[in-house]
Swiss-Prot record:
It holds the Pfam family PapZ_C. Keywords: ATP-binding, GTP-binding, Nucleotide-binding. Coiled coil: none annotated. ATP binds at residues 15-22. The keyword Chloroplast does not apply. This is Nucleotide-binding protein STH186. One of its GO terms (molecular function) is ATP binding. Displays ATPase and GTPase activities. The lineage of its organism: Bacteria, Bacillati, Bacillota, Clostridia, Eubacteriales. InterPro entries: P-loop_NTPase, RapZ-like, RapZ-like_N, RapZ_C. Belongs to the RapZ-like family. PANTHER family: RNASE ADAPTER PROTEIN RAPZ.
Amino acid sequence: MMDVDRSIRLVIVTGMSGAGKTQALKYLEDLGFFCVDNLPPSLMPKLAELFGQTEGKVSRLALGIDIRGGRFFHEILGALRQIAEIGVAYQILFMDASDEVLVRRYKETRRRHPLAAQGRVLDGIQRERRLLQELRGLATFIIDTTHMTPADLRKELNRRFGQDRESPHFHVNVVSFGFKHGAVLDADLVFDVRFLPNPHYVPDLQPLTGEDPAVVEYVMKWNVTQQFYRRLTGLIGFLLPHYVAEGKSLLTIAIGCTGGKHRSVCLANRLAHWIRERGYSVSVEHRDMPRPADRSDEEEQP
């Protein structure tokens, strides 16, 4: 047996069907876990061993196990013993909810319970609860989602498995773009700065970009720009901690001008710097700067 990195964090996610296991795995993935769902228990030790040999490339692994595994499910206790034998510590996250809520969720989704193929949903739930009783007793964490919204579940998982705010699990991506080249489709926030004075109409500035000091000075010297930037940073400063608290992992802020070469580039750089100074992980992307084939006609209008 090869040496295994014992620092790897392994979380086994299981519990009642309909209690939120799939959603939990999705949120754990946002927190930096490598997630595998509906894995036969017999494969768990081998997978844990393989990921323990990645030399730190994967340090957080979450495995989803549920009753859909059918005849494989009884193997889980033996698999847990094997994982312990190879030196990988694990935690069991058991997702639960009241029978009443589980029945309602199944009826709302019109899905069939895996253990109630021909019978009532409640019969399947009660049978599953009996089968999982021993595993529930081994759980490190039990999360009851009876009264939880998806946002509540995200917050709870972030509290138990998240890291510091400054970690890469919350990241801000600031994108400059030109409206004439199309919108940024995955943007969470979009700001249109085409109302600002346009360097395109200053001959000496036209061939430059928003990364050139002369363009930055021109864009930022106007009172309207300064007022807008002050209000922009005020809004972003208000929003960021609320996005973190909600459990959002990636926030994309798009700033657009006509061609994506001058005004949006300048303001995207300044905003990214401002966000970075406040301790957040941030990157900046200038999607449309420059497009060599279009340089002769960039920013044709105000």
